[in-house]
Amino acid sequence: MSRYRGSVCRQCRRENMKLFLKGDRCFSDKCSFDRRSYPPGQHGQRRMKHSDYGIQLREKQKVRRIYGIGEKQFRIIFKKADSLKGITGETLLSLLERRLDNVVFRLGFTSSRTQGRHFVRHNHFTVNGKKVNIPSYIIKAGDVVELKEKSKKVQAITDSLDTVVRRGVPQWLELDKDGFKGVVKGMPAREDITLPIQEQLIVELYSK
């Protein structure tokens, strides 16, 4: 899957919201979005009118960027959500939240989803005592996500855990900070996902 290699701060400005792609920097006064909260480019400060399709497309792109997922993989996740019982849009967000790279970020082990993806791939975590190095692995209720013994001294992880109080942990997860592990207490409900996402726009886009 191809990866965006430009400035991640430009992505926040493009979507007109903080995507929290740079960890602690997003919470500091160094955040580019706080200083320039308008789209990048020569005409960024002009007000643009979008068609219904354009609005739907922007919403999909925003969610893709939040979770760091390419178009092909995002479409696969949407099809899975559409095939399951329940409201498609809410199921889509639940699947995205339950990705392992997102869960380790939500638990506070990493400062961003990008860093979470990196550490998962490099075998820093186990799920129910077994090695899992696939960022897209879908976590289930009752699963225990634990940091490997050798990884407990990784500075980036300990630094991130020190800021977890400020960021907070969702109600569907429980962090044992001293034990370097987290428990999935249940499935994420729609109200647990506080990002300004209009998932119905994505459903409408893919229904065309």
Swiss-Prot record:
Superkingdom of the source species: Bacteria
Annotated source species: Desulforapulum autotrophicum (strain ATCC 43914 / DSM 3382 / VKM B-1955 / HRM2) (Desulfobacterium autotrophicum)
InterPro entries (UniProt xref): Ribosomal_uS4, Ribosomal_uS4_bac-type, Ribosomal_uS4_N, S4_RNA-bd, S4_RNA-bd_sf
Cited Pfam families: Ribosomal_S4, S4
Gene name of the record: rpsD
Keywords recorded for this protein, A-Z: Ribonucleoprotein, Ribosomal protein, RNA-binding, rRNA-binding
Quaternary structure, from the entry: Part of the 30S ribosomal subunit. Contacts protein S5. The interaction surface between S4 and S5 is involved in control of translational fidelity.
S4 RNA-binding domain mapped to chain residues: 98-168
Cited function: One of the primary rRNA binding proteins, it binds directly to 16S rRNA where it nucleates assembly of the body of the 30S subunit. With S5 and S12 plays an important role in translational accuracy.
MF (Gene Ontology): rRNA binding; structural constituent of ribosome
Family label: Belongs to the universal ribosomal protein uS4 family.
Protein name, UniProt field: Small ribosomal subunit protein uS4
GO biological process, any: translation
